[in-house]
């Protein structure tokens, strides 16, 4: 009743009667009014729909903006601990292989797995810690349990696993133990050429992949190239010959053990190109399990220390040939010039003498074959400090070598603070200036190739060529003849390998004492050799640290009894591998023999 009273009439009588009096049709008027009202209703509904749609669009835009902002924040952040969800996208380029001069693999990549723990999924932390400690000797069960029950959500256990280790971990049956695929660096030859290759480790890491970075040796020197995707299919080729490297290391290790040496180094180099065919340092290490840096003791006692390019030693009488070669070049002497060998020489509170009495005088060639300190010192006095320094500098003895290894910068020669007459005389026979075995090999290569400087290299594709002329071909030829005489008539008779005409010079130098001066019971012995003398192709330098031959009643510590026989065995082993055919005609094609100078 109330609802009916409140209705508004669609056709009020007050409007109908006036309309009829005017002659209008009330039905048409009402129909038109209804049409207008319906259109107004539709327009209102359309406006309300548009408003609702706009609100929905604005709402979704706000939601997507918030999500995008959150994703951007997560992408740019660096979490304290890696998590699986944020690392799946880490993809690193494959590291290029390293091969020897014949294309044999020295370093490559191996697909493996890393082991990590998501602690929230651990069912039995104590049992898991115990089982892992049983599997890995370097893990402690209590330490693991403490980490498993801490607030950490993620924990690395092992960065790389062998298939056997992976299976053993899988057998534990713990859901919180997870495996992440990755590539690791593999050195298939173990410790062979370890000081050349150096080693690699992991840089940026994710649970699905890891970046391999070089930490030492060639791996570090050429790290950016090896990681460059454009080089990943092209291996880095070295000058090293794997077979020869193995032979050198085998003989060197045996000699080191037989002679009770503390360490050893050997370098085999082409005299015309500077290509290093073999470079060894002992003790060595396995780059697959590279040891940590030493925390105590001397750095050169560590197996990581490369004695061939980092070890700086007084190289003894091996230096004498440089003194004589310079004097010949300056025309101060000729091979037959008689040199006063009376001793001792007293200068500046120091006394210079020979190992044994060589008489009152010797010709220059015999100063070398008899290894006379007195004769060499007097020849050096003729040369003078300034010219001696210039000559040794031209041979590279005053700065680190340029070989392509990051460690080479550490092999900086130790020069005298004051290069006066006393230092000039002692340096002439290898005391007072310390250099690396690689310096010595480079200097002897210059003598062997006719007097031109060479640059030592480990890169097979390096553009090579002889450098500046340091000494004349005639002086180089005479120097080789004298070095051959050291083997046939002098202190290196054990180096006369049948068929290969070896030339060379021995060197024995006492080691500096921690209390000052020199320790007479400890020395460095070296032998620098060139072969074959009729067509010089290779130089071999062998250096032994604290070696001594104890086969007789008295220990023998000189190079003739230590470094020389080791060098001879290396030459006998590697010469056939180098393609050298022995000659047995006993003719020297140097063009000069000691008989030319003998009276």
Where does each model-flagged region fall?
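Periplasmic/cell-envelope proteins involved in peptidoglycan metabolism and beta-lactam response
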Residues: 1-293, 312, 386-398, 551-599
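Beta-lactam-recognizing serine transpeptidase/beta-lactamase-like catalytic domain environment
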Residues: 107, 266, 271-317, 322-547, ...
